[in-house]
Amino acid sequence: MNKTILALAISMMASGAAVAGGDFGLEVQNLLRAQSFKFFGVVKPLTASETVSVSRAPGQTPKDLIKLAPGLNAEFVTRKAGQNSDQMAFWPNDIKPTHIITCIEDFRDPVDNVVGAYPNGQVKFGPSIQRVNLKTGAVETILRGLSSCDGIRRTPWNTIVATEERDDGGLYEILNPLAISELTVVTRGASDIIDSTGATVAGQVEYRGAVGKLAWEGLDLSQQGVVYYGDEERPGSGGANADGGSLFKFVPSTVWDGTVVTSLSQSPLVAGNVYAYQASCQNRTSSSFPQFGQGCEIGEGAWVKVDPANLRTSADANSATGFYRPEDGHFDPLYTGSGVKFCWTNTGNAGAKNYGEVNCVMDTNPVGTGEVTIDNPAVNAHGLTYLADSAEAKGFAVAAANRMVEGDTDLNQPDNLAFQPVTGNMYVIEDNPFGDVWACLRDSNDRDIKTDGCVKILSVRDGSAEPTGFTFSGDGKTAYVHVQHSSDTACVDGSDCANNDGYPTDDLVKITGFKINGK
């Protein structure tokens, strides 16, 4: 708990202030709400989620569609983003972006997701990746032919990577998202790309098979080119006793050295190995480390090698730790320790009273120092290969995962995640009807290792929609969010929310008014 809040709580009790029903926890919760301007830069948080649905319609303002904490303002960037617009990345940087590059989470379907044909008769799929001009709101399609494009990031070497949330989903890398338009992936899982005339286009988009196939969502990439990501899989969905999705990392064969990438052949994503986090029931110096099994979900663990051709099956077979639908994930920008701190959401199922969580893993040596294979029939890791770290006593690369945010009856089913620059506050976005966006404090110098508290700052007013892709620009004072998959019944031809290029639309909203240190 933040020391300021604790001191205030003690002061109020000492002065005889009544704590309703003796509920100290509720009083602390209310104290945080009362100081929301100091800690979150908003006048005050929302007290409740929206409950009365407001359908999408022509002529609306953003505040017709989202309920905002007092002090925040909103405007449409565009009402013409492709329906099912999901995560987004700024281009060419976070500080002064000119465009947002977005994923469209729709299936590749030769019947249901065809919006027409090009002049040469070639099938025109719905959009998969679009760019939005932040000055004009103009929306242009970069790429078609993916299935359920979801996670998207700008890499440290200034390319764009986009991923598919399908069981056999892949990752595709784009050299320059402003230099190409109306390209199509001929076959998923390959780098065969054509333009609107049917001509082959080489060197602009590459499928990255080395990172593997799985149901992608969030990811982050280190300066060296190490990629962290999860598999959005519910436990039991793959059959009896099947684990939930695992947490993976790709370690490139050649790390990025900071050289400007002018060709996709120079990307560190060309080749490498994939490992899955395997929580251990024993500490890193134990003679039985890594010792794994049911009940070991957090704490110190090792990185077991898996087969990128089928990551989910391989992770299960090699006893990687499973979670309940790992979804979005990002590095903590204020982490100052060795390596990286990667935080990700596990959505859970509120209907089953599994309210979800946000976990963070600290990985001190992301690249490792080669591999080590266990040859000891007396331990349950016999025959498995792991990422090595020669600086560790047992020789294994070790990461430590713990829970940062635990869901409850109000904050639950976390889906997306964002860190606010400057403050490092974590924003948690729900996957719910009338979904909320929560702002969560960092952990301070108290006893626990969890957030010091969360407040609600946004609630979607359309019960058919959800907030997604929430992210901050580099100054931490401006946020963007998609109001995804609204019912568009009222958006008739010619209206501001009508179809765009033969495809239904979503709203991209810009939110301003966040204060940092009172400014």
Labelled PLM ranges:
Residues M1-A20:
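Gram-negative bacterial Sec-dependent N-terminal signal peptides
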Residues G21-K519:
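Sequence/structural signature of beta-propeller domains
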